[in-house]
Amino acid sequence: MKVMKILLVLPPTESAIKRVVGTTGPPLGLAYLASMVREEHDVKIIDGLAEDLTFSDIAKIIKKFDPDIVGITATTSAMYDAYTVAKIAKNINENVFVVMGGPHVTFTPELTMRECPCIDAVVRGEGELTFKELVDALSKGRELKGILGLSYKENGKVRNEPPRPLIQNVDEIPIPSYDLLPMDKYKADGVPFGVVMTSRGCPFNCVFCSSSLQFGKRWRGHSVERVIEELSILHYEYGIKEIEFLDDTFTLNKKRAIDISLRIKQEGLDISWTASSRVNTFNEKVAKAMKEGGCHTVYFGIESASPRILEFIGKGITPQQSIDAVKTAKKFGLHALGSFIIGFPDETREEVEATIKFAKKLDIDYAQFTIATPYPGTRLWEYAIANNLLLTMNWRKYTTIDPVMKLKHFTSEQISKLLRKAYISFYLRPKVLIKDIFEHHGFIIKRAIRGLLRVYYQA
């Protein structure tokens, strides 16, 4: 077996939007992959965003490290940056094996390798075991046939191996290789910042989300002990004081959410944190425990004030449940962030205006407004394709602030104008500004400025 030199890359981006928005979190997926293969191979991770690297910098690193394998991850809007890294790697060494992973390529393996012939393979879905088997095969000179979850080139065509079954006991996955990341670069408003995924899988199937297809509909959670171990490493070894839990729904298993929160308190971990919750998986017991455990903000996917649009989304919630969840959060001293999506295919102006009004009516501290975006793999993508709604397949536009679908009742300019109106009308209210000065020390103003910059200076 050959010891492989493996370079894992989160590409830099040509867009300034990442720098405008502020917080950049560690590329957790790459750190998981590294943890799976580092015992037998030489692994290096490049975070092009956090380290503010140029493509020229990437080229120099590749030349110096001389990897056998280059693994790249990217969001949909950063795919062209990933392609650039792949081309750089192949130009330096045509024999290097280039592989990509992530939600976008999971659902577009043939298209990805057609758009960028420098990519040799795509890891689909949950990637740890597939990547480990790929590295093992390459190190031993074996063929790739039979590696579940892998798509690769064979005789000029793309061969898609069958999907890989999901990892049932996620505690078997090693703790991410945080030591290979530039942990000192991750800050949230100047505070050392980290991200943790305590569970995988989502039993829901919202029209705009591919999570249940990427990580399965069956929820799989880490043990409380494993979560505390990972938090302790981040806090004591890297000085992390602010955590974002990346679970789709941290509160899906209420008892476990309570247990994790109380253990954080019992262990004396001096961290504050945020987490996402559905409005119908949140109650007073959960809110109380989360607050006691150091949580300061809960992210709610409220999406719309229109029951008709909520039904189209497949959200499975009501506006009243959103009102109740926000009230519960506020009762226990938690800040609430509401996420809202406008611009679904046949959404009316009255429905969009009602959603903006609803956001202001709710007692939420922060609001995030986006335009409905049909990402590959989602039901919204399938709907847009079936109804010929796509305006572009320029992935750079898939930012959630650029309109990429034809809408029945709006032009692209009109829905963009409504997005700007949503941010301005929510944040530039006397009630919000006064509350911000006395309770949030200007944090809401900072968030509003970031949101508005995202909208006005689109990627």
From Swiss-Prot:
InterPro entries: Cobalamin-bd (IPR006158), Cobalamin-bd_sf (IPR036724), Elp3/MiaA/NifB-like_rSAM (IPR006638), Methyltransferase_Class_B (IPR034466), rSAM (IPR007197), rSAM_horseshoe (IPR023404), Tetrapyrrole_Bchl_Biosynth_MTs (IPR051198). Signal peptide: none annotated. PROSITE patterns: B12_BINDING, RADICAL_SAM. The keyword Transferase applies. It comes from the Archaea. Its EC number is 2.1.1.-. [4Fe-4S] cluster binds at residues 202, 206, 209. Belongs to the methyltransferase superfamily. This is Uncharacterized methyltransferase PH0819. It comes from Pyrococcus horikoshii (strain ATCC 700860 / DSM 12428 / JCM 9974 / NBRC 100139 / OT-3). The lineage of its organism: Archaea, Methanobacteriati, Methanobacteriota, Thermococci, Thermococcales.
